[in-house]
């Protein structure tokens, strides 16, 4: 595991030893690592120890909307993996597998929801703030829109979010809620 040696380039980026600048891919893209600075190596360590709820708790500190990212959106962490000369670790798929393992538990959806709102590993804000009295409308529910909505809710604001596309309810086997 890379974080024990301070080489978790997937989180912090792959740097040139001489200039300390980010290395670049063959296409000229900086290998800057995870834009959220997610604790990826720590998450994998918890997962391999069999603690997949702990692994998810570690991931959602920096990326509470891991359900919408994972292998679907970003792979900057893979581009910066120190195992470039071999096959890089498929970090986004590991995130997704960890989330699925938790969602398949009894009360799995509730566990994930709880970790995104009340997470004791999140030292900056382990619990949501009190109600602020503000009401916010978020238009557009792409990755930025639903992440903004989440953070606004944790800041104590009442949030209504709309999107141009039809939004389907989550499968009842995951949410426990029958529409």
Task: Go through each PLM region and give its residues.
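Ferredoxin-type iron-sulfur electron-transfer modules and their immediate structural context
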Residues: 1-130
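N-terminal FAD cofactor-binding segment of flavoenzymes
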Residues: 48-51, 174-179
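General N-terminal targeting signals
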Residues: 98, 106, 111, 143, ...
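Short acidic, glycine/serine/threonine-rich loops at helix termini
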Residues: 95, 150-151, 171-174
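Glycine-rich FAD pyrophosphate-binding loop
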Residues: 157-177
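N-terminal Rossmann-like FAD-binding beta1-loop-alpha1 element of flavoenzymes
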Residues: 134-160
